Amino acid sequence: MKATELREKSVEELNKELIDLLKEQFNLRMRKATGQLNQSHLLGKVKRDIARVKTVLNEKAGQ
């Protein structure tokens, strides 16, 4: 997800998106630990998406 798309969302939507991404990250980590994750690049992708959402939330908090 791009930062420009995230900036168009409300704070409530961003918080929901953040919770969803954190749940997805948890599930991917569990799958990796049990050896069921073949696409390890997804962990990095989700991590970067979480960082993008947090950045936009901080930008909105500063306004």
Curated annotation (Swiss-Prot):
Signal peptide boundaries: none
Gene Ontology molecular functions: structural constituent of ribosome
Source lineage: Bacteria, Pseudomonadati, Pseudomonadota, Gammaproteobacteria, Pseudomonadales
GO cellular component: cytosolic large ribosomal subunit
Keywords attached to this entry: Ribonucleoprotein, Ribosomal protein
Coiled-coil ranges per UniProt: none
Organism: Marinobacter nauticus (strain ATCC 700491 / DSM 11845 / VT8)
One of the protein's GO biological processes: translation
Database matches in PROSITE patterns: RIBOSOMAL_L29
Protein name from the UniProt record: Large ribosomal subunit protein uL29
NCBIfam families: L29
Superkingdom of source: Bacteria
InterPro entries in UniProt: Ribosomal_protein_uL29 (IPR050063), Ribosomal_uL29 (IPR001854), Ribosomal_uL29_CS (IPR018254), Ribosomal_uL29_sf (IPR036049)
CDD domains the record matches: Ribosomal_L29_HIP
Pfam family, one: Ribosomal_L29
Family named by the database record: Belongs to the universal ribosomal protein uL29 family.
